[in-house]
Amino acid sequence: MASNVFSEIILFVSVLIITAAVSGILATSTHKISLGLEQRGDALSSQLTKDFEIINDPGYVLKNATDTTMIYLKNTGKSPITFDKEVISVLVDGNPVEISNTYVEGDSSVRVLGSSKVGKLHITYNTSGYHRFKVVTSEGIARTFTGEIV
């Protein structure tokens, strides 16, 4: 009789240990999933609040006397965008081009494009005709524009 009691106690304790281990694993997994969702939500929120548009006239993309082409961007998001030639990339017809300078309209010394502000990119590209421009920010936000350099 006593051996049955000990067997049942051992089985009961074993079940308790297994149950505790399984619940610990489930709690840890749930916590990791929760953290992952929170991080992805923060990243998506950051991308949604940082947005811009290329506002050039498609029929008249300006080229100045030093053969640099000007691309105008407007920050249409709620958060400022880093506006520096080191963190912005420009592709013309799929090929990367050098940005010679960046300017924020109204204050050329600022390197942050605030909400609703307009910035100007000077790119070293001077071939006339229709071209496809793609601007990519450091946050990975990209906009494409087709226009004629005159």
From Swiss-Prot:
Show the disulfide pairing.
Answer: none
Pfam families on file: Arch_flagellin
**What Gene Ontology terms describe what this protein does at the molecular function level?**
structural molecule activity
Q: Does the keyword Ubl conjugation apply?
A: no
Gene Ontology cellular component?
A: archaeal-type flagellum; plasma membrane
The UniProt family comment states: Belongs to the archaeal FlaG family.
| Stated name of the protein | Putative flagella-related protein G
Q: Which organism is it from?
A: Methanococcus voltae
